């Protein structure tokens, strides 16, 4: 293959290995796209694949939506699930929605808990959900606040809701169907973003 500029999957890889009985197969009901030999076919296949991969997203605020908000919940010992949330996330997973948390975390900016505490809590949340075959696709957070006493967190950030920074990151990172997506929050800042 070293001398060839382009490889043809069928001609150069699959058929020679079939003839040598060095290839195994498995039947799938999914679609496959042959992107052909040219850039036009590649671009067409890319568009089709992106369309297939796009799916709606349910964005969730965290405190007050998935857990009780006792004020600055940043550690496992202060986290308590809201009733029905795990079941709702499982339903969204089964309906082929991305489920993404977008959460302001001023408690980090104020020094009530650390980013490490926050990540430990995320691990606990994910682990707890996985017991019920439920999952989150991503957790985005904003640790910044203009009134922070900690220099590295003291700033005005578009990540902080009602800014749209976390949503923009999600749209960049995932194939999200915007027209069918929604956000569930408990504050005006959630609705405004």
Regions found by a protein language model. Name each.
Residues 55-98:
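Active-site neighborhood of HAD-like aspartate-dependent phosphohydrolases
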Residues 78, 188-192:
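Catalytic phosphate/metal-binding cores of nucleic-acid and nucleotide-processing enzymes, i.e., regions
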Residues 18-19, 90-94, 130:
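Anion (oxyanion) recognition and catalysis
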Residues 2-5, 77-78, 111-116, 154:
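Short, solvent-exposed loop/turn segments at secondary-structure boundaries
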Residues 1-49:
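Catalytic-core segments of class I nucleotidyltransferases/pyrophosphorylases
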Residues 155-188:
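Conserved Lys-Pro-Asp/Glu-containing loop-to-beta segment of HAD-superfamily phosphomonoesterases
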Residues 85, 89-125, 135-145:
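Substrate-recognition element of Asp-dependent hydrolases with the DxDx(T/V) motif
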